[in-house]
Amino acid sequence: MIIPTTYNLLTGIISDAIYHHLDIQQFMEEEQKGCRRYRQGTKHQLLINSCILEDCKQRARNLSMAWVDYKKAYDSVPHSWIIRCLDIYKISPPIKEFIKSQMQRWTMNITLRHTNGEIHLPDVKVKRGIFQGDSLSPLLFCIAIDPLSKLIKKESIGYSLNKSRKKKDKVKDLISHLLFMDDLKLYAEDEKGLEKLIEVVHEFSRDIGMEFGLEKCAKCTIKKGKKVNGTNIEIEEGQFIKDLESDTNYIYLGIEENATLEHKKLREKARTEYIRRLKKICRSELSPKNKITAINQMAIPVLSYGFGIIDWPQKDIDSLDVKTRKILTMHKVLYRNQCLDRVYLPRREGGMGLIEINDAYRNAIISLDFYLKTTPDKHLQNVKKQHQEDLHQNKSIPKLADIFKTAHEQVNNNNQTNETASEAPDQEQCLKLYPYLHHERASKRERWKTNKRAGLFYEETQKSYIDQKGSFQWIQNGELKFDEERLLIAAQDQGLTTNGFLKMCGIRQDDKCRFCHNATESTSHLVSACKILLADGHYTRRHNKVCSYIHWTICRDKGIPTKEVWLHEPQPVTATDDVTIFYDKEIPAGRYIENGAIKPDIVVWDRQSRSALIIDVSVPNDFGINRAEREKVTKYQDLKNALKDEWQLKDIAVIPVIIGATGLMKDNLQCYLDSIPGMPKKYQVQIAAIRGTVSLLKQALGTHFQ
């Protein structure tokens, strides 16, 4: 069923009002973490649950647990009970009447198809169940199920994490149940108490017309910290909640458990699923950027969901990062010699945007530590106390967090970096809540800067005349296909397997260029300085792609018929009554030009306005774009003066279009492009240049870049 957008907006507003009312009046029980704001939901419940299991095991205590699952819970809750609960919780009468009137309008069409035709029942009224796609329905369900929490707590049965010998203190801190939406887990110190709690839950459920899904319900009995075989609990004649067998686990909120959490098995299961998803994403036809996004959103959460619940030794975290990079390299997403720190930086800063598992783990621990210290939940405070006093350093969230904080503070003191003014507006808040991530990113930038090979490009991007945002636009947009992105990043990092690189690694004796056999073969030499590649036309083809795009935009602006940009073939002379466009053609100047510079890439002569533009394009090495601009402006000054006199112009300008071979741009490039008719897009100029560089490198290196 498709829910109208207007209805979603309206129910969202109503949901906010109801939640605010419930929160102010403290009507909802803390045990329910579904729809609770400023809480970590399932992670909150799993923290408490894991501490109960750990406490029971360490102190050899008795514990009886039961997992209760409802059969089609969302579709079973009666509308009449929801309306009754709205009265109980003193919801505003207009809101209650609106919800009631909407429920009365809920209908469905039923069609039964058979061999002789079909039977159609229109407008069948719906008296049970709620939507599963709007903002209000989950909150209504939590309101309808909340009285169950109150009934369970009245029994004063449960498990206490409080070590006090006073019965009064233990009763005060009893944990009788945990509830997330309809996922219910019950706790008692013996089977008799558990049976009583199950009886309360069953009676309540039966009264409001909800049924247990017995095939998904189970119980577990622990005596003196060890699992024992218990008896099945009969809830009705012939209906039992079965005792969980020793070799069987129950999946509670996504985490398998029995009498304890088997951390080694859980780690291996998470690792296997993560690797499976990672390989599946890498084998897909997605672009490199979308592959990284898919890994961050679909693979990393398999691991991060259990951080803080499942014990992860640091060596396992590190090995997963290594395994990830190895798989990405095998599937040609990463290049084996590229700067690793760039892989984990955001794309807007020139990285690839991959989440490092080590960062995700440490940030999760620090965030949970902050959550434990700031959340006013009595059960969670007992969890914090247990982590601080009882658990080993490798399992304790506060202790691990202190280690990680100390580590990143030392790194930050050693590597002071100036943050750019382009940081997000909520930088201070992020720094307080997620300090490790913030400082680790600065640390990665520092390591990139100090890298002997990759640091050269980083230093170039930090120069005052460089357009940082524009220079990384190609990687942020992620348009390069298959292995092109990794090849270009490796070229920026001077990490391609050139002869110079192989000699530096001790693999080759000769470092001379495989084409010209004169200069040392480096990435910079291959992309812009090899005489043989120049003679073979590799640089010219790249240069002409940029010129062709600029020529196409000028023609479009002047109303000259053109094909699509990828089919455009510039002619030496293109003219209308008012405009003449010269392309790669010698311009008769009418007088001697001393330096012989009479053949710019494009000349636009507008007779009507008596103006002209001399446009010359260059795609030099990234480290030479400033020099190339000066050379172009100086080179055509004589031609500019000659044409001004010859054509009797009022205005004539030299427009240098300089783009680095791997995409680096000056901050004044946009101004130059804006002065060209049609205003060519800076990004399109960049992408034309870097695609030419990628094609050049593939042909030059052959199989050596694989």
Task: Put a short name on every predicted segment.
Residues 1, 31-36, 63-73, 99, ...:
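Catalytic palm active-site di-aspartate
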Residues 1-147, 151, 483, 492, ...:
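Conserved pre-catalytic core of RNA-dependent polymerases
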Residues 72-89, 174-206, 223-224, 261-263, ...:
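Catalytic palm subdomain of template-directed nucleic-acid polymerases
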Residues 113, 211-248:
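Short, conserved micro-motifs composed of acidic
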Residues 238-314, 332, 367-380:
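Basic, alpha-helical interaction scaffolds
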Residues 320, 335-508, 512, 698, ...:
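Extended C-terminal regions of large enzymes
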Residues 507, 557-614, 630:
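Active-site metal-binding core of divalent-cation-utilizing nuclease and nuclease-like domains
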Residues 652-706:
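Domain-level recognition of nuclease-like catalytic cores that cleave nucleotide substrates
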